[in-house]
Amino acid sequence: MALADENSPVYMHGAYQSIRSFFKDEDKFIEVFKTGKGLRWGEHHHDLFEGTARFFKPNYIGNLVNSWIPSLDGVEEKLKQGAKVADIGCGYGISTIIMAKAYPNSKFYGFDNHSPSIEQAKEQARKEGITRNVEFSSVSANDKSIGNDYDLITFFDCLHDMGDPIGAMKFAKQSLKPDGTCMIIEPMANDKVEQNLNLVGRIYYAASTLVCVPNSLADNGPALGAQAGETKIKQISEAAGFTKFRRATQTPFNIIYEAKP
């Protein structure tokens, strides 16, 4: 299961492929540590893009529809009836396609500023025959072309990477319906470093040092990293104008937050 089944919760190839990309980008990391200027997501070796998608996919398959969406207040019923959803920072579109398959009455829009990933998302949707209720576009998290009147806006393991997470959340709030919901999936993390010095936390800190933090620094961002913690994510949501924020559910690897206008 760990080596042969891409949908298995213990599938490891995605993690190994991501790690392989780190060795291929060694010279870039040396420069990043020398200058502190950062390194954008799209400047990494392409193994990172595919490896990250393969790493997250089993977790999303096992939890997104079965537990994460049901943990949100009133969202599942809206999706069953027919809702409008924006998946911000969708990458290869794994999360977008899973939701589109599970809720055929709803319309899903996947957005990411990394064009090669969006092309992969489009191709995957075609392969799976999911084209009627899903669309993908290469735009940034605050691009006006994203539109508005969304019932649900999602950020899957990406808000902490952004150069302007408050700006992204402000734009999300403006794009939601008054009774809409923002679902923020973040890596499992406590608020203090010493509370995160476990197996999962150490893995996230290591990857974050090479991927998440440099990406944010490249845009002069706050460099939250993959172990930002609940307090920091709540502060960002409140600074963006959301009035309600709660931890909806969690797994050993992720925390699912719900924010409402």
Predicted regions and their residues:
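A short acidic, Gly/Pro-enriched loop at the edge of an enzyme's catalytic core
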Residues: 142-153
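A short SAM/SAH-binding and catalytic strip from SAM-dependent methyltransferases
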Residues: 151-165
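Core SAM-dependent methyltransferase catalytic element
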Residues: 241-261
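Class I SAM-dependent methyltransferase SAM/SAH-binding core
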Residues: 84-86, 96-142
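C-terminal alpha-helical "lid/dimerization" subdomain adjacent to the S-adenosyl-L-methionine
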Residues: 185-239
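A short glycine-rich, Lys/Arg-flanked "PGG" loop and its adjoining helix->strand segment in the class I
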Residues: 166-178
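Conserved Class I S-adenosyl-L-methionine-dependent methyltransferase catalytic core
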Residues: 1-83
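Class I SAM-dependent methyltransferase "Motif I" SAM/SAH-binding loop
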Residues: 89-93
